[in-house]
Regions:
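Hydrophobic/basic alpha-helical segments
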Residues: 1-138
Length: 138
């Protein structure tokens, strides 16, 4: 986060890291590496970078999230050996990869489940209040 309370600087740095991973995937695909290896590398090097801290920066403006999503689509096309203009939604499904927005939703759902189960520190109680048996964020 920068001095203007924006995630732009963080996402630019993340984009550079993800671009390097895309280069690795591309070179490995050119060496005829199996799709299973490419997928494993994607999860180890790409998705792990996306997931780290996503609960904090996942609410950044759509323009910034779209930059990451664009890189994610490139990675999925490389793994699938698909063309530049091929639609990626079926590729995501075939590879069992969630897009960045779905990863964010999953992390929120997991966090709220852990909160409701009482598995989180009590400090998080001050973040939420109950209204008619529902939880809303302060």
């Amino acid at each position: 986060m920068d001095d203007r309370l924006s995630w732009k600087f963080h996402i630019q740095g993340l984009s550079k890291k993800l671009s390097r991973t895309i280069g690795i995937l591309y070179r490995l695909r050119k060496m005829n590496s199996p799709k299973s290896i490419l997928t494993s590398i994607y999860f180890a090097l790409f998705q792990s970078q996306i997931s780290y801290g996503l609960l904090a920066w996942g609410t950044a403006c759509n323009d910034l999230i779209d930059k990451i999503f664009f890189l994610q689509k490139r990675a999925v096309r490389i793994i699938s050996n698909a063309g530049f203009n091929d639609h990626t939604q079926p590729l995501f499904k075939k590879l069992s990869i969630l897009n960045i927005r779905d990863i964010f939703k999953h992390q929120i759902a997991s966090f709220m489940y852990e909160y409701e189960s009482g598995n989180l520190p009590t400090i998080f109680d001050s973040f939420f209040k109950r209204v008619n048996e529902s939880i809303i964020r302060d």
